[in-house]
């Protein structure tokens, strides 16, 4: 990513959910020169795309066979639980509730009233 100085509400991460992570990694390597680095077996196939030694995005296998392969945008928040309540109050839905992500913080998934997914 271009910066690590994110304000609440700013996009701070992006990752790709794919049915074929090997094919996706090959495609983005050919397109952008991104190298895929696995996060290890405990990450369930999730890993990081790197360019010039810097992490630029991530890739992981879809967990739901009905899900459509897509890029997900993540937004900075100081409190995932409060954001979850705010999403519901604003008319969005919670796809999955806040959970801990290793030592990286907390993550939750949402859908806005128009059907767009984000986290």
Residue positions per predicted region:
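Core segments of cupin and vicinal oxygen chelate
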Residues: 3-54, 89, 99-105, 113
